[in-house]
C-alpha cells in the first residue's frame, strides 16, 4: 500500500473587533464553497510565514504581518494528509479584494457554527472556541 503524501498548509487567524476573517472556496476548487481561514499550501523551500504572506497577497491582495503559530492539526483526507498550521496575523493594509476566493466574511465566535468548514479548518475552529 502506498503511503499518502503529507501536504503542508498554513492559515491566517486575522481578528478585528472580535470578528475573524474567513474565506469561501471557489465552486471549481476541491471541497467547493466550504469556508476556511485564509491561507494555502507551503511551496518547497518556503517558510510557513513566507507562504502566508504570499498566499494572502495572491488570493485577496492583503498585506499581513505574521505573528505566532497558535494551532497545528493533521487531518486525513481521501488522497493525502493535511498538516495545517495556523498563525495569528495582523492586517497591515486593510483593503480586501477577493481575487482567488469566492467570498469572505468577518464572523464572531458565535457565528462559526453557521458556516461549513473542511475537516482541518473545523478542527482549528474547535480549538479556537475551546481557547486551546
Language-model-derived ranges and their functions:
Residues 19-58:
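Conserved Nudix-box catalytic region and its N-terminal flanking loop in Nudix hydrolases
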Residues 59-66:
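Short secondary-structure junctions
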Amino acid at each position: 500500500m502506498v503511503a499518502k503524501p503529507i501536504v503542508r498548509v498554513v492559515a491566517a487567524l486575522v481578528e478585528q473587533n472580535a470578528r475573524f476573517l474567513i474565506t469561501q472556496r471557489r465552486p471549481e476548487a476541491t471541497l467547493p464553497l466550504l469556508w476556511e481561514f485564509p491561507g494555502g499550501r507551503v511551496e518547497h523551500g518556503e517558510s510557513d510565514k513566507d507562504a502566508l504572506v504570499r498566499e494572502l497577497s495572491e488570493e485577496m491582495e492583503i498585506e499581513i504581518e505574521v505573528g505566532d503559530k497558535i494551532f497545528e492539526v493533521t487531518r486525513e483526507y481521501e488522497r493525502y494528509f493535511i498538516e495545517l498550521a495556523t498563525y495569528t496575523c495582523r492586517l497591515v493594509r486593510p483593503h480586501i479584494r477577493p481575487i482567488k476566493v469566492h467570498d469572505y466574511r468577518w464572523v464572531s465566535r458565535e457565528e462559526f457554527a453557521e458556516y461549513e468548514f473542511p475537516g482541518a479548518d473545523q478542527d482549528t475552529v474547535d480549538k479556537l472556541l475551546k481557547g486551546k
